[in-house]
Amino acid sequence: MKGSSLSLEIAEPYAQALMSVSQSNNLTERFGEDIRSLLDLLNNSPELREFLSNPVIREENKKEILQRIMGDQTHPYLRNFLMLLVDKRRIAFLEQVCEQYLALLRQLTNTVLAEVVSATELNDEQRQSVIDKVKTISGAQAVELKASINPDLIGGVIIKIGSQILDASIRGQLRRISLSLGGV
């Protein structure tokens, strides 16, 4: 269901409502931080994702788990929003709602999401270099990096900004050389 048009259709109004609440209370960044933490948790815990999306599990149990996970650090408006998702039986779309909220937040703050794949983990200097390059290409004020590692790249990076892909990997360079030699 992840990424389907139906889930987007369901998630979008909830994300917009959450954005509206966060803007009217000047909490957009705070909600963004909490939502990023929640997404990390969902991505690292398939059990939690399955628990929340399981229709057999009672709403009270889902609320209790969410209360424990979110704790007192999370703003009450966001906690109440999560309880609303449970009540409306939309908690299965939590991941999509969170992703959509972050997309709206990036749009609001003129931030682009750059997905970076590298052969090894990027150090701070390399991360900053990628951020600077993405800012130049996109004209955005800020860049949110989503980094992953793929040792098959041998070296270099692949940067994806929206639908644009920049392949500066050694594997990509070797492939381009191979194609050009094959055409000779």
UniProtKB/Swiss-Prot annotation:
Keywords: ATP synthesis, CF(1), Hydrogen ion transport, Ion transport, Membrane, Thylakoid, Transport
Molecular functions (GO terms): proton-transporting ATP synthase activity, rotational mechanism
Function: F(1)F(0) ATP synthase produces ATP from ADP in the presence of a proton or sodium gradient. F-type ATPases consist of two structural domains, F(1) containing the extramembraneous catalytic core and F(0) containing the membrane proton channel, linked together by a central stalk and a peripheral stalk. During catalysis, ATP synthesis in the catalytic domain of F(1) is coupled via a rotary mechanism of the central stalk subunits to proton translocation.
Similarity comment text for this entry: Belongs to the ATPase delta chain family.
Keyword Transferase applies: no
InterPro entries: ATP_synth_OSCP/delta_N_sf, ATPase_OSCP/d_CS, ATPase_OSCP/dsu
Any GO CC annotation of this UniProt entry: proton-transporting ATP synthase complex
Protein name: ATP synthase subunit delta
Entry annotated with the keyword Transport: yes
Locations listed in the record: Cellular thylakoid membrane
PANTHER family: ATP SYNTHASE DELTA CHAIN
Species, as recorded: Gloeothece citriformis (strain PCC 7424) (Cyanothece sp. (strain PCC 7424))
